[in-house]
Amino acid sequence: MKLTVVTFALLAFISFNTFAKQVRLDNVAVIVDQGVVLESQIEELVNTVKRNALTNNQTLPSDRVLRTQAIERLIVDSLQNQMAERMGIQISDPQLDQTIDNIAREDGTTVEDLRKNLASEGVSFEVYREQVRKELVTGEVRRANVRRRIYITPQEISNLVTLIDEQGGQQAEYHLGHILIGFPPEPTDEDVSKAKDTAEKVLELLNNGSEFAKIATASSSGSKALEGGDLGWMNINSMPTLFAEAVQGTSKDDLIGPIRSGAGFHVLKIIDFRGIEKVEVAELKSRHILIKPSVILSDEKAEKMLTEFRKELLAGEADFAELAKEHSADPGSALRGGDLGWADPNVYVPAFRDTLQSLEVGEISQPVRSTHGWHLMQLMDKRVQDATEKRKEDKAYQLLFQRKFAEETEAWLKEMRDSAYVELLDEKDNS
């Protein structure tokens, strides 16, 4: 009996200690409004950054600095996740699977190969999968909250179109490194002076050969600090205006700054740059006659009707435009003799598109069934069109939207962070 009691007590002691260790591992490190950041989350993010740095042969600042940056990232993530819950934003498994499939395809691989690559790096596919889900959720939250803050005037579009025209369609893209030495929303002269001095010291270190990514991770207040300040590739027209003006006439590896903005002082590095070629699109001019089957007109009779029209046209006994005006069920083109004008064939449904692309100029197709009904089509002409010129207004709008979205996202995240209740429970995070 004593042996049983001792054994039970020993097992209870082991279980308690094991549980205690788990609790210590998952201690609440930060209270963020109605949520928390766990110690395990901080360690996981720090380890991920270290693993990525090792893979990319990148040096990192001290663990203390890295921990501080990780905590800031997780605070912002927690606030966004809480907002997502309030908004009822969810990503279904099919949506998630499709996204991961797209990621693999864009990388020229398969989901199975992606699994293997993750495993070789010691990353569980399920962990990766849930991380992608979280990124999709935060992306939805940002779009929902930031989009309403963006307004683009016709004059802005017109001005950018003029700029694009002046550049002759040869748009430059820059791969930028970014360090932000921030100051408060309403800085004193002392705040500004202190931030400027720090930015100048950072620039001096970089000019003396210090690694940009390491300095960015240690010192930057920007949203990409944990990525070594890497902003990726940016079109000159989609980057913040201050940056777009500053990078003009620069060369690879140039350092720029400090540049003052409302957020602080920026230091940029031109990691690389490249030009963008004009996009040319093959357009087709065509016309068609559409016959829609109905209760009165069977599918078979509709096809036979177009077959007869084709025979008459090939024999020169009928006029295509007149047949279209009299019989076509497409009201948009019937009044124009079936003329669809110039268009990128990809705007048409697959059956129509594929048939049209297979025709020679002047050739009349066999009757073709699509989701709209039966078509008889004729290819009238072909041309290669400069898509950049044709779509320049849409492009200008998208570039302006991207620029403003990036700027407003930073502002929105800062406002959300500044207004949140945040309590660091571990004193070493406050010191």
Swiss-Prot record:
SUPFAM superfamilies: FKBP-like (SSF54534), Triger factor/SurA peptide-binding domain-like (SSF109998). GO terms for molecular function: peptide binding; peptidyl-prolyl cis-trans isomerase activity; unfolded protein binding. Keywords: Chaperone, Isomerase, Periplasm, Repeat, Rotamase, Signal. GO terms for cellular component: outer membrane-bounded periplasmic space. It comes from the Bacteria. Its EC number is 5.2.1.8. It catalyses: [protein]-peptidylproline (omega=180) = [protein]-peptidylproline (omega=0). GO terms for biological process: Gram-negative-bacterium-type cell outer membrane assembly; protein folding; protein stabilization. Pfam families: Rotamase, SurA_N. Disulfide bonds: none annotated. Residues 171-272, 281-381 form the PpiC domain. Residues 1-20 form the signal peptide. It is an enzyme of class 5 (isomerase). The keyword Heme does not apply. It is found in: Periplasm. The PPIase activity resides only in the second parvulin domain. The N-terminal region and the C-terminal tail are necessary and sufficient for the chaperone activity of SurA. The PPIase activity is dispensable for SurA to function as a chaperone. The N-terminal region and the C-terminal tail are also required for porin recognition. Chaperone involved in the correct folding and assembly of outer membrane proteins. Recognizes specific patterns of aromatic residues and the orientation of their side chains, which are found more frequently in integral outer membrane proteins. May act in both early periplasmic and late outer membrane-associated steps of protein maturation. HAMAP family: Chaperone_SurA (MF_01183). This is Chaperone SurA. It comes from Pseudoalteromonas atlantica (strain T6c / ATCC BAA-1087).
